[in-house]
């Protein structure tokens, strides 16, 4: 398949993943990654491109990855782009539009292990226990938002997608639609239930009235707005540290694992499809145990202390 033929089904592919229920953010990322790939393949000299006029090969995609690496992209970003390319190639093969998948045997760049940053439990408790101005609907909304974020460990995309009827306050749980449209039920803390009960009577609603967290005009808060409100809240009330929804989720996972030691339960609560994704939080747990050991064990103290 020549390059023109390879790219010819691009729009049909995007329409297909929209029908599958992929989010706008995911579809936009696939679009960017594939448009970038097409441009790279078109720019390659024939000796790099593996004979594009005759067809595309594994060497073409390896060369494209090498070009992106030379631009300074990190291993995580390269692995994500390769995943986007693979999804497209697999779709073409499945429909008989490509004989074999030239990306199938390409190994993604090895990524350095990254330990998530968790916020101190005491700091979070102090911040979330700050007085809330009950006369300010946005302050009441934000408090409910942040309690839910830390209390249930939801992704920012999951919070963005919540509807009011996803929350069951009497039973103290929330129905969450996660990655890949996977459904799960997550418990609510007592603090989250209380904060949501204070917020719901003040919620501004638009014409559809579905969104749980809305702005002044009643429309659903965007992911960017949620991130911005959290950062502003932390900057105004905290000690200057940067706080993101991802860090709140990491904190939830790390603190829960410290208390429960049940990694399978934490996996279910986080909505991870693979246990290996959850296992990174065991490093946070080990750090906590190591600090306790250093503080408590009589043989852990250095001689000069």
Swiss-Prot record:
A matching Pfam family: Phage_int_SAM_1
Domain annotation Tyr recombinase: ranges: 114-294
GO biological process: cell division; chromosome segregation; DNA transposition
Domain Core-binding (CB): 1-93
Gene Ontology terms: cellular component: cytoplasm
Enzyme active site: 155, 179, 246, 249, 272, 281
Family annotation (Gene3D superfamilies): 1.10.150.130, Intergrase catalytic core (1.10.443.10)
Gene Ontology MF annotations: DNA binding; tyrosine-based site-specific recombinase activity
Subcellular location: Cytoplasm
UniProt entry keywords in alphabetical sequence: Cell cycle, Cell division, Chromosome partition, Cytoplasm, DNA integration, DNA recombination, DNA-binding
Superkingdom, natural source: Bacteria
CDD domains recorded: INT_XerDC_C
Main location: cytoplasm
Family affiliation: Belongs to the 'phage' integrase family. XerC subfamily.
Protein function: Site-specific tyrosine recombinase, which acts by catalyzing the cutting and rejoining of the recombining DNA molecules. The XerC-XerD complex is essential to convert dimers of the bacterial chromosome into monomers to permit their segregation at cell division. It also contributes to the segregational stability of plasmids.
Protein name as it appears in the record: Tyrosine recombinase XerC
Biological source species: Neisseria meningitidis serogroup A / serotype 4A (strain DSM 15465 / Z2491)
């Amino acid at each position: 398949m020549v390059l023109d033929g390879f790219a010819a089904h691009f729009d049909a592919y995007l329409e297909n993943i929209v029908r599958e229920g992929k989010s706008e953010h995911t579809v936009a990322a696939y679009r960017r990654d594939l448009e970038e790939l097409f441009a790279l393949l078109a720019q390659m000299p024939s000796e790099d491109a593996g004979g594009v006029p005759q067809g595309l090969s594994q060497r073409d995609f390896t060369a494209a990855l090498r070009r992106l690496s030379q631009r300074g992209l990190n291993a995580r970003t390269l692995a994500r782009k390769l995943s986007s390319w693979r999804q497209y190639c697999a779709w073409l093969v499945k429909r008989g539009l490509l004989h074999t998948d030239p990306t199938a045997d390409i190994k993604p760049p090895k990524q350095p292990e990254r330990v998530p940053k968790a916020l101190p439990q005491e700091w979070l408790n102090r911040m979330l226990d700050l007085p809330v101005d009950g006369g300010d609907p946005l302050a009441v909304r934000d408090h409910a938002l942040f309690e839910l974020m830390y209390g249930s460990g939801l992704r920012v995309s999951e919070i963005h997608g919540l509807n009011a009827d996803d929350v069951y306050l009497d039973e103290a749980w929330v129905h969450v639609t996660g990655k890949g449209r996977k459904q799960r039920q997550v418990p609510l803390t007592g603090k989250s239930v209380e904060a949501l009960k204070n917020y719901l009577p003040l919620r501004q609603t638009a014409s559809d009235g579905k969104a749980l967290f809305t702005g002044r005009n009643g429309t659903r808060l965007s992911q960017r707005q949620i991130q911005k409100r959290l950062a502003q809240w932390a900057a105004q009330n905290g000690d200057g540290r940067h706080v993101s929804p991802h860090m709140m989720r990491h904190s939830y996972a790390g603190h829960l694992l410290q208390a429960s030691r049940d990694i399978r339960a934490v996996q279910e609560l986080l909505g991870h499809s693979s246990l290996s994704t959850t296992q990174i939080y065991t490093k946070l747990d080990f750090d906590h145990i190591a600090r306790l050991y250093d503080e408590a064990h009589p043989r852990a103290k250095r001689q000069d202390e």
